[in-house]
């Protein structure tokens, strides 16, 4: 400080920093050297020091805050308030924490370390939701897949998705990922399958899934690993559903489905299975385990009875085993 006074330097009261694009590099490059080169060192150090000194310094780390910063200056005679600086400081520490977590996760995956000594859960806010599982609970959804900013889902029509919608959607997608490439329909209610069917005919696949439990299916979420056509759309519209997901929809199907204005119509843009671990949170910590990605195969069956099942029965056993692991009691 004495040297600054001697040189008649003004104190720095504004820092604006953009980090090296580590995430983008991870997505676009497999070269280890290039990835490591894009680990920012000076940027995070500068941001942390400025954020710690929020009493005197404004730190901006997100371009979405540039306009807020300008508005703040205009409202306060060219200055920022302590509250604004503290909010920006909070965002800055959130960014450095997120940035370091992505880097640590990359190292752990490369070193095949599944259960590191220190573990952080990270993500980018995708959307604020109207409420959580119940109306009195506040909620947001976060994206942690670097390759899918839209979570692999493209909304075509309908209301915004709710907390319960998302919970049911990803439960359905998990089941679809365990089924072979036969046209399959999954109907989910309260994160539980109430109807699952595979058939060479997509329309029969939907009908069979629905008749499994038509009462529970009411107000559920339908997930299909095939393109929805006019005939399937007509069947769907006979019942009230919250959400319809499919790999695609033809023009005539969309015209029919859009008659129900509140129906959420979602195109599955990416259903690739990931090795993301399963996390269960509780008050004092969380449980972490490998995701149960094993697909049951009839080759794993051992028959210990004299009477052997038929080929049809074996096929049904295989199907049932791949579905029942998703049922929650």
Task: Map each language-model feature to its residues.
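ATP-dependent carboxylate/acyl-activation modules
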Residues: 13-17, 99-101, 109-329
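Active-site loop-to-helix "anion-binding N-cap" substructures in soluble metabolic enzymes
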Residues: 1-111, 226, 280, 288
């Amino acid at each position: 400080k004495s040297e600054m006074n001697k040189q008649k330097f003004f104190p720095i009261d504004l820092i604006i920093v953009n980090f090296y694009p580590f995430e983008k590099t991870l997505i676009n490059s497999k070269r280890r050297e290039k990835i490591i080169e894009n680990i920012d060192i000076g940027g995070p150090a500068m941001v942390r020091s400025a954020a710690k000194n929020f009493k005197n310094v404004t730190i901006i780390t997100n371009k979405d805050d540039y306009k807020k910063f300008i508005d703040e200056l205009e409202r306060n005679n060219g200055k920022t308030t302590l509250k604004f600086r503290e909010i920006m400081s909070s965002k800055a520490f959130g960014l450095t924490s997120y940035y370091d977590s992505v880097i640590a996760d990359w190292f752990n995956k490369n070193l095949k370390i599944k259960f590191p000594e220190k573990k952080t859960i990270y993500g980018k806010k995708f959307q604020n939701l109207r409420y959580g599982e119940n109306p009195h609970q506040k909620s947001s959804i976060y994206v942690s897949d670097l390759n899918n900013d839209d979570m692999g889902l493209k909304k075509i029509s309908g209301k915004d998705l709710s907390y319960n919608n998302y919970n049911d959607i990803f439960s359905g997608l998990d089941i679809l990922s365990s089924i072979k490439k036969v046209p399959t329909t999954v109907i989910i209610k309260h994160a539980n399958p109430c109807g699952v069917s595979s058939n060479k005919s997509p329309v029969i696949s939907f009908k069979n899934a629905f008749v499994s439990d038509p009462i529970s299916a009411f107000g559920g979420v339908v997930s299909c690993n095939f393109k929805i056509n006019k005939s399937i759309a007509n069947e769907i519209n006979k019942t009230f559903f919250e959400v319809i997901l499919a790999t695609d929809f033809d023009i005539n199907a969309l015209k029919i489905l859009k008659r129900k204005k509140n129906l959420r119509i979602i195109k599955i843009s990416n259903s690739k299975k990931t090795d993301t671990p399963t996390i269960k949170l509780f008050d004092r910590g969380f449980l972490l385990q490998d995701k149960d990605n094993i697909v049951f195969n009839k080759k794993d069956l051992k028959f210990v009875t004299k009477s052997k099942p038929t080929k049809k029965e074996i096929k049904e056993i295989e199907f049932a085993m791949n579905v029942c692991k998703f049922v929650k009691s």
